[in-house]
């Protein structure tokens, strides 16, 4: 049977024939008794809601369908529309089989509350168990728990949820509504304001950019409450609210176990899934934990985990990912792309990711190409390693942090801006092909644990043998049954766009140089007064972006400011040389390791032989990165 096939196959859903077999089973048996019922629930989707429209019902429905269709790549399996007076709610669903059941928008048993959700509630069982009044779910979707949570706790219900989500709850009893976004902004959400006074919510900007007079990113960790016609913050963790520095000493065992729990929570899946594996520390830890848990779980739906990496031929990431995959035992897929394939995809990437930020586009393009192949292989969910650098100070420029206070403030600012950069890239580039990305490093509980650690423990101190993300590496550096090879566990940080191949960035610069004339660039401020491009590459992306999204409101959804190796502007003051570096890539600070250790900690290279092995092991990687950069330029 198809069910047995899933259990024994070395590759999930390798052909359309298997999916058709599954669909046939769903037609022959009730969903309640089907052994594949757990694979039916909707997950990563696209949502659109319009409240207070002045249009007649027929025109409102037509407008709703038009906007929702632009989100169909996020949920290509089924569409659901509901009109309630002058309000419209639409849902584009990603499902495995039997698209006629479990559709959204969904309602409570009394048909009073309507939910339209995109995301994943990992603690849905706990939410149901803690309800003051028992609730019998109508479907197998974890997101349905939002409805009884709202009925039980009112506007405070998001505090009871753990996951990644953006959703709208409409209460027909008083014609009120609440929109909500998760604590970090892992899933995208925008709010728009129509000329007729209507309020819009959409998973992506493209659903509302030509229908709303103005729009903006919905702030993470907030709800929009129609009763006050404004935002209210629901996420108030201690690391944000406290004015002094956290002082908890690092407990390596507790840190490791906390992250393992975060990964395992995200292995809850209704679909065939895999991991994105660059070969760097973050994604490698995620993959290793997944494999360990699957090996220990006799009921694991698939016998082996599939991992995926992308890069130009002979790129650093492909080599490192293969090494990790061989160590942990995944079925690995190295996906090579050519520079021309990347260039051909740039316009589509900007359309899907909805940004003109240079580093985001550089990194999104190979991820976009990889996601297309992942979807073609039958995978609909992947785990990824985004967020670790923001939580542990993993970017190379953190070597220049002058003190613990500056280090911690930069971490907080980076986390607060994740929804505009890495989360935006990871979600939109991957979901552009109907694949759901999950990011365990941004788990609610793990984040509070990691951000409660004394920042002095996270700082880079070569005289103490501490390289970037030292405490994370140390937490997983075990001798018995090691998680990763030492060469990977202590490998230097690479930005994703660097790791896939240095010539990718150099070619992008060359193309921009050819496309954007000196005269065009000289008058950049006249054409783009907001976030004026500082390089020809930035001008090139901005030009494409405004052809797709011509509204001034669209440009203002993208953050600006100068950056070095993904820094915020505040960190530019850490080193005078940052102001003169012309590239936003991590390559711009490739030599920062030696400089920072020597200048910041007054440690001479001649004394490096006395440093701990972990710090010494990092130098070859840094040297190799600089050598490859020089070769690429030559």
Annotate each language-model stretch with its function:
Residues 42-356:
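Cysteine-centered catalytic environments shared across enzyme families
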Residues 40-44, 376-383, 402, 406-634:
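Adenosyl-5′-phosphate
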Residues 252, 310-374, 397-409, 425-429, ...:
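ATP-dependent adenylate-handling ligase core
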Residues 253-274, 367, 372-379, 548, ...:
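Phosphate/ATP-binding catalytic cores across multiple sugar-kinase/actin-like superfamilies
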């Amino acid at each position: 049977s198809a069910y047995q096939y899933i259990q024994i196959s070395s590759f999930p859903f390798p052909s359309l024939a298997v999916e058709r077999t599954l669909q046939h089973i769903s037609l022959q048996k009730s969903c309640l008794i089907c052994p594949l019922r757990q694979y039916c629930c909707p997950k990563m989707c696209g949502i659109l809601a319009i409240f207070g429209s002045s249009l007649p019902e027929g025109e409102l429905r037509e407008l709703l369908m038009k906007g929702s269709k632009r989100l169909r790549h996020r949920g290509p399996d089924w569409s659901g529309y509901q009109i309630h007076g002058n309000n419209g709610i639409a849902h584009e669903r990603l499902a495995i089989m039997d698209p006629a059941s479990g559709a959204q928008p969904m309602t409570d048993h009394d048909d009073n509350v309507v939910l339209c959700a995109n995301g994943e509630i990992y603690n849905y069982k706990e939410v149901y168990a803690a309800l003051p009044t028992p609730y019998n779910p109508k479907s197998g979707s974890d997101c349905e728990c939002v409805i009884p949570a709202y009925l039980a706790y009112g506007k405070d219900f998001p505090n009871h949820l753990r996951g990644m989500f953006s959703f709208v709850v409409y209460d027909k009893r008083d014609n009120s509504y609440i929109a909500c976004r998760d604590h970090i902004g892992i899933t995208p959400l925008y709010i728009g304001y129509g000329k007729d006074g209507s309020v819009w919510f959409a998973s992506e900007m493209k659903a509302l950019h030509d229908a709303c007079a103005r729009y903006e990113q919905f702030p993470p960790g907030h709800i929009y409450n129609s009763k006050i016609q404004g935002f209210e913050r629901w996420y108030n963790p201690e690391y944000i609210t406290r004015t002094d520095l956290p002082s908890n000493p690092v407990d390596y065992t507790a840190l490791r176990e906390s992250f393992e729990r975060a990964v395992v929570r995200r292995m809850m899946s209704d679909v065939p899934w895999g991991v994105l594996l660059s070969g760097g520390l973050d994604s490698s830890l995620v993959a290793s934990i997944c494999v360990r848990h699957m090996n220990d779980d006799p009921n694991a739906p698939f016998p082996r985990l599939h991992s995926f990496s992308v890069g130009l031929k002979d790129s650093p990431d492909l080599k490192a990912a293969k090494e990790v995959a061989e160590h942990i035992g995944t079925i690995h897929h190295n996906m090579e792309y050519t520079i021309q394939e990347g260039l051909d995809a740039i316009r589509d990437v900007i359309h899907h990711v909805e940004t003109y930020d240079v580093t985001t586009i550089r990194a999104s393009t190979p991820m976009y190409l990889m996601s297309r192949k992942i979807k073609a292989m039958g995978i609909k969910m992947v785990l990824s390693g985004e967020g670790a650098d923001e939580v542990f100070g993993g970017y190379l420029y953190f070597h220049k942090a002058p003190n613990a206070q500056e280090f911690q403030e930069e971490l907080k600012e980076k986390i607060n801006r994740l929804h505009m950069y890495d989360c935006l890239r990871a979600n939109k580039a991957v979901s552009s092909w109907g694949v759901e990305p999950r990011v365990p490093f941004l788990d609610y509980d793990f984040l509070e644990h990691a951000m409660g650690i004394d920042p002095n423990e996270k700082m880079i101190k070569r005289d103490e043998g501490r390289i970037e993300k030292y405490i994370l590496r140390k937490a997983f550096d075990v001798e018995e049954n090691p998680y990763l090879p030492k060469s990977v566990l202590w490998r230097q940080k690479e930005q994703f766009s660097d790791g896939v191949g240095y010539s990718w960035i150099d070619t992008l610069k060359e193309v921009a140089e050819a496309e954007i004339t000196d005269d065009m660039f000289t008058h950049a401020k006249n054409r783009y007064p907001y976030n004026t491009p500082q390089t020809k590459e930035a001008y090139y992306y901005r030009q494409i972006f405004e052809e797709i999204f011509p509204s001034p409101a669209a440009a203002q959804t993208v953050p600006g400011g100068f950056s070095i190796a993904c820094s915020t502007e505040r960190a530019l003051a850490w080193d005078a040389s940052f102001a003169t570096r012309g590239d936003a890539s991590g390559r711009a600070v490739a030599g920062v390791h030696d400089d920072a250790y020597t200048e910041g900690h007054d440690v001479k290279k001649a004394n490096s032989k006395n440093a701990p092995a972990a710090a010494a092991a990092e130098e070859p990687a840094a040297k190799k990165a600089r050598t490859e950069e020089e070769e690429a330029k030559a």
